[in-house]
Amino acid sequence: MNARIGVITFPGTLDDVDAARAARHVGAEAVSLWHADADLKGVDAVVVPGGFSYGDYLRAGAIARLSPIMTEVVDAVQRGMPVLGICNGFQVLCEAGLLPGALIRNVGLHFICRDVWLRVISTSTAWTSRFEPETDLLVSLKSGEGRYVASENVLDELDGEGRVVFRYHDNINGSLRDIAGISSANGRVVGMMPHPEHAIEVLTGPSDDGLGLFYSALDSVLAS
């Protein structure tokens, strides 16, 4: 079986090519999905990549969540499809109600573009099963609205249910409880602000630590 990973492109998406390259790097077929498509083209998993979908008008991810392709993604999630939202994709997943909380302006109100260290907290997701708990990853962060916020009840629930997937070592954007990524209750949907697709080889990125997410998704698809 050849796993097919769909990568969505919205107007304003920047990192779809990188996400598709990461999928191919682990041996999957990368399938392009346009925002106006009402068909997931038979893919086994979906990546909602980073950028500025629809120019981030109204609010980051607010318009993208209403697109035909996201209607299909929401339906597919109900059937257990693995979905990864990266940066703006994380914002889209929160706006679509697939993940709790929201992403707001960074502390200091500056755009941040630098490599950061993350710690893997949960390996019980479709996107992190290849990692050992407490593994440290070096990946890129580039966002102006990357500060994760949620109510204390939601934060307690995420911690209590093991749904915090990544935490920052150096919390430079002010995310509550150092949260860099979270998952759905069943671990099939993961959202994260840093960019694993930019860390798939040391020649072009800070490390190859991001490959583990895409290999994990491959394992999940092939095991199902």
From Swiss-Prot:
GO terms for cellular component: cytoplasm. One of its GO terms (molecular function) is glutaminase activity. Keywords: ATP-binding, Cytoplasm, Glutamine amidotransferase, Hydrolase, Ligase, Nucleotide-binding, Purine biosynthesis. Pathway: Purine metabolism; IMP biosynthesis via de novo pathway; 5-amino-1-(5-phospho-D-ribosyl)imidazole from N(2)-formyl-N(1)-(5-phospho-D-ribosyl)glycinamide: step 1/2. It catalyses: N(2)-formyl-N(1)-(5-phospho-beta-D-ribosyl)glycinamide + L-glutamine + ATP + H2O = 2-formamido-N(1)-(5-O-phospho-beta-D-ribosyl)acetamidine + L-glutamate + ADP + phosphate + H(+); L-glutamine + H2O = L-glutamate + NH4(+). SUPFAM superfamilies: Class I glutamine amidotransferase-like (SSF52317). SMART domains: GATase_5. Signal peptide: none annotated. Its main location: cytoplasm. Its EC number is 6.3.5.3, 3.5.1.2. The keyword Hydrolase applies. The keyword Cell division does not apply. The active site is at residues 87, 195, 197. It is found in: Cytoplasm. GO terms for biological process: 'de novo' IMP biosynthetic process. Residues 4-224 form the Glutamine amidotransferase type-1 domain. InterPro entries: Class_I_gatase-like (IPR029062), PRibForGlyAmidine_synth_PurQ (IPR010075). Part of the phosphoribosylformylglycinamidine synthase complex involved in the purines biosynthetic pathway. Catalyzes the ATP-dependent conversion of formylglycinamide ribonucleotide (FGAR) and glutamine to yield formylglycinamidine ribonucleotide (FGAM) and glutamate. The FGAM synthase complex is composed of three subunits. PurQ produces an ammonia molecule by converting glutamine to glutamate. PurL transfers the ammonia molecule to FGAR to form FGAM in an ATP-dependent manner. Part of the FGAM synthase complex composed of 1 PurL, 1 PurQ and 2 PurS subunits. HAMAP family: PurQ (MF_00421). This is Phosphoribosylformylglycinamidine synthase subunit PurQ. It comes from Mycobacterium leprae (strain TN). The lineage of its organism: Bacteria, Bacillati, Actinomycetota, Actinomycetes, Mycobacteriales. The gene is purQ.
